[in-house]
Regions:
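His/Asp/Glu-enriched, well-ordered alpha-helical/loop segment
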Residues: 195, 216-220, 269-348
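Histidine-rich, glycine-flanked metal-binding segment
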Residues: 1-58
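Active-site core of metal-dependent hydrolases
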Residues: 142, 146-148, 161-266
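Histidine-centered catalytic micro-motifs
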Residues: 59-70, 195-203
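C-terminal cap of metal-dependent C-N hydrolases
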Residues: 337-407
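Divalent metal-coordination and catalytic microenvironments
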Residues: 16, 31, 53, 64, ...
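C-terminal helical cap
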Residues: 15-16, 21, 97, 249-251, ...
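Alpha-helical scaffold segments that flank or form the walls of functional sites
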Residues: 54-56, 60-62, 71-108, 114-131, ...
Length: 407
């Protein structure tokens, strides 16, 4: 991986397995898939990567990261919010998420208050340094926006948009006037043509109904999360709330791996109920080793695993919640392993999606037609010589790369 971030040469992914069971070659030219054919049928003048033993998937995306506080859980005392410190942490966090497969990250950043715009400055610097490796979008999240105390927050939010924040965030649960807070966010977003991402626990049906009614129809769209409080509503109330969210076209972002800064409640909303009502549900990581979750991993495949194991989704639906559906919620182009689609891909060692979600150790990540990250794992067992061979003890390792430079 010695190419500069801006370069994209021809690339052939050979012998990969798709979720439908086919073994294929995938030829990539620039940032898009040029051709898909039966394994062994395609050639290239560029680099060939041997993906025998790997499952090839559309790359996931991260809809809810906290870049300004990431990797601060072990800090002695309050974490630094100096731009240079935030830039370093945000860069490290985004690269960790990239190694897991996320080629796009929506990063929430607090603005205003004692920190001012320093954390946003750091995250925007990280975005620039990561260009060509991953797409990092900053969400400016204010605290108060109403009353005398909210004037500074509203000014900071406007300044954040001028600096380059790509999404307008909000925290209506933290404002004495949640409706006024939401109205201020939506007005600013409409004026600039930006999407909205609101932090809410979703445990107050009346408040959520007002918020949903206000947000409905806004383009390019509104996300709400983590909405853990929805799981605490009585069944009929939860069903009515789900119907309102679906009618408004609002996306619910759940965090199955844990909590995040600013959320009072832990847990996951009723994912199957929301999906049955027609709500678009996506899954994110939330806190990444900060005060809210000191053991956060930032791994979208773990989020998918938890949706499958804890929420009863099929492996396919669970993975779509961190990949295709998330990309749609973030306004990103759709990805399929077909000619003409963006070359945003994740190869995971395994022969099926369920196995990949369970034991997704070795991974290869492709962003804009380039291999941008590799993680290789080898599993071995201590044996007693011939007995190991006789019993066929499993070993996970890298396939023979051959002369063409496989993984």
């Amino acid at each position: 991986m010695s190419e500069s971030p801006g370069e994209a040469s021809a690339l052939l992914l050979g012998g990969a397995r798709l979720t439908d069971g086919r073994a294929v070659d995938v030829r990539i030219a620039g940032p898009r898939i040029e051709a898909v054919g039966t394994a062994g049928s395609l050639t290239t003048s560029g680099t060939r990567v041997d993906l025998r033993g790997y499952l090839l998937l559309p790359a996931p995306a991260e809809p809810h990261a906290h870049a300004d506080t990431a990797l601060t859980g072990a800090a002695a005392g309050p974490p630094s919010h100096r731009p240079e410190d935030v830039r370093r942490r945000a860069t490290e966090a985004a690269l960790l998420q990239l190694s897991h497969g996320a080629t796009a990250v929506r990063a929430h950043v607090r603005v205003g208050g004692v920190e001012g715009l320093g954390p946003l400055e750091g995250v925007l610097a990280a975005r620039r340094s990561l260009r060509g490796l991953t797409e990092l979008t900053a969400v400016a999240v204010p605290r108060l926006l109403t009353g005398v105390a909210g004037a500074d927050g509203l000014a900071a939010l406007r300044d954040a948009v001028d600096m380059g924040a790509g999404v307008i965030g909000g925290s209506p649960d933290l404002d004495p006037d949640p409706a006024g807070h939401t109205e201020a966010v939506l007005e600013l977003a409409a004026a600039h043509g930006l999407p909205v991402d609101l932090h809410t626990d979703g445990d107050d049906p009346a408040r959520l109904a007002r918020l949903t009614a206000m947000a409905g129809g806004l383009r390019p769209g509104v996300c709400l999360g983590p909405c853990a409080g929805l799981s605490r509503l009585p069944g009929e109330e939860a069903a009515r709330t789900a119907d309102r969210l679906a009618a408004a076209g609002v996306t619910v972002v759940c965090l199955p791996q844990g909590c995040c800064s600013g959320a009072r409640l832990r847990g996951t909303p009723p994912v199957r109920l929301l999906r049955a009502a027609g709500v678009r549900v996506v899954a994110g990581s939330g806190a990444l080793r900060d005060g809210a979750n000191p053991v956060g991993r930032g791994d979208p495949l773990e989020a998918a695993y938890l949706l499958a194991s804890q929420e009863g989704l099929s492996p396919g639906h669970a993975y779509d919640a961190v990949s295709g559906t998330t990309r749609a919620a973030l306004g990103l182009p759709g990805v399929r392993v077909e000619a003409g689609f963006p070359a945003e891909l994740l190869a995971v060692r395994g022969d099926g999606l369920a196995g990949a979600l369970s034991l997704a150790y070795s991974r290869i990540v492709v962003h804009r037609g380039r291999v941008v990250a590799r993680t290789s794992a080898v599993r071995e067992y201590r044996d007693s010589g011939a007995a190991a061979s006789a019993h066929g003890l499993p070993r996970q390792g890298r396939t023979d790369s051959g002369p063409c430079g496989g993984p």
